Every structure is written in C-alpha cells, then in structure tokens.
Amino acid sequence: QGAEYEETRDAGLTKLEEALKYVEETGVDCLAVAVGTSHGVYKGEPHLEFELLDHLSKEVPVPLVLHGGSGTGDENLAKAVRTGIQKVNLNTDVSEAGKQALREALASTEVHGSGKDEFTPKKMNLQQTIAAGVAGFQAELEHYMKLFGSENRW
C-alpha cells in the first residue's frame, strides 16, 4: 500500500520467471505487474523500474497492467505506457477529480445550465449533483487519454 511504499517497494517487484509461469499455468489474458507503483496515496516518491518493465513487456506474452497509477506522475505514466503497459488503473486520481469538481460546484454561486435546466448550487437536484462529479471524472479521464495517446481510439 502507498503508506508503506518506501519500506515494501522492492520486495514485491515482479520476477520474470514467476510472471511467465503464472501466465502459462492460469491462461490469463493480461497481467498486472509490480514495477514500483502502489495502491493508495504514496508516502514517498514513486520510483518505477523501467528496465524491468521493458524486459517484462518483451518476454511476457499477454498485455501488461499497471495497478496503483494514481499519484505516479504524468511523466512516469506516459513512459510506462511507452515501455509496454497497456492498461493503467487510476481510481484515486479519477475519484479525487470527481470529488473536487463536486466541491467546486457546490461552493460556486454561479448559475449553471440554461433555460429550464438552469440552477444554482443551493438548488441542485440529485441528477445535477451527480453530473457535476461526473464532469470532473470525465475531465481527468480525458487528460489521461491524451497523455497515453488513446484519444479518439476505440
């Protein structure tokens, strides 16, 4: 977990032999690899093992997944994708963006929407509240899609 990152990071790094054996024995269609990220909020600075990731991506015959991508930084994440990661999990970053967008909408005094859909934060209904949070999620996801070169791709 992120809180113990500095103490536990190296012990759990993926070993090529174990990864190959696991993929062969289980028949999984993708593999989450440990290359220096951690779930949750980091205590300390994340240090990804790009050499290990490069080696794994060349040898492991299934797409690689990066868990704990939140808080890793755009530069590290973009490099991880260029080095072989094909799926990045970013729940904390996306959730926080949604919560922050909702906080901002509720604290705002602006009129939102237009015509019959016009509302102020004090008169937001449930759907409008949800929409404010979803807008934050969407903006964060769009950021990552552009960062990873996934924009306008299916």
At which residue positions do the language-model features occur?
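Structural detector of well-ordered beta-strand residues that form the stable sheet scaffold
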Residues: 65-67
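Alpha/beta enzyme core
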Residues: 1-62, 74-83, 90, 97, ...
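C-terminal alpha-helical cap/extension of soluble enzyme domains
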Residues: 76-154
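Short, surface-exposed acidic/glycine-rich loop or hinge patches that mediate macromolecular interfaces
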Residues: 70-71, 93
